[in-house]
Amino acid sequence: MTNLFTRHTRRSLTALALLSGGVYAADEVNAKILSRSLRVFVTGGQVLWDYRIHFKGIERDHPDYHSKLQSLNQRIAHRLLYLCFENGGIYTKFGQQLATFNHGLPREYTMTLAQLQDQAKPVSFDKVKQTIEAEMGRPWNECYKEFDQTPIASASLAQVHHAVDALGREMAVKVQYPHLELQMKADIRVIKWAFQFTEYCFPDVQLQWLFPEFQKALLAEVHFDAQCTALLIIF
């Protein structure tokens, strides 16, 4: 019976692995959404565990409470920095906006997350080519005589490349990151859940007031790019 159960279990796990691999290969966008969401959940679990261990047996009136809180905030801030940078896109924008809330967040967060203002993770040139070709309706090298593969600037939602078009005009081309609007809906839901989870675990921490401001700014920027630039801005 045990051997039979083991064989069935092994076959089930193998089938599940093959199915998961097929889904991942067939739907790269959803796979990336899943991986980013899992990174959020893992980070949330790390923060909760760190808090419970760090403050075990320590009350607010303890003489070391304030210093321990500062060190905990710093560790959490570094975890958020890593999370936003690795997830990129909307998460980078989220971290950048958190860094501006000097009036509502501890200094450890605003100072650490401010690094995202100058550090955005660029996408590969293959993705850039796909975006250009989808927008222009023809191969990218028919649109440009020269196109620098390394971006001259990378922002949270787009990056800029130096190029020379077919007429010999030098220009900067702004390329919005691929699948941004598709990913945005899922990412926003996960970020909202993270706010709710934080307030549930830490009733004294009020964060949900930040979410409407973040969502409003994000939608305005994404829609501006989509309506006014159609993924490409030529300066």
Curated annotation (Swiss-Prot):
Main location, first listed in the record: secreted
Signal peptide: 1-25
Keywords annotated in UniProt: Host cytoplasm, Host nucleus, Secreted, Signal, Virulence
Keyword Ribosomal protein: no
One CC-aspect GO term: host cell cytoplasm
Short sequence motif RxLR-dEER: positions: 36-60
Chain ranges passing through the membrane: none
PANTHER family assigned: AARF DOMAIN CONTAINING KINASE 5 (PTHR43173:SF28), ABC1 FAMILY PROTEIN (PTHR43173)
Domain commentary: The RxLR-dEER motif acts to carry the protein into the host cell cytoplasm through binding to cell surface phosphatidylinositol-3-phosphate.
Protein name as it appears in the record: Secreted RxLR effector protein 27
Provenance organism: Plasmopara viticola (Downy mildew of grapevine)
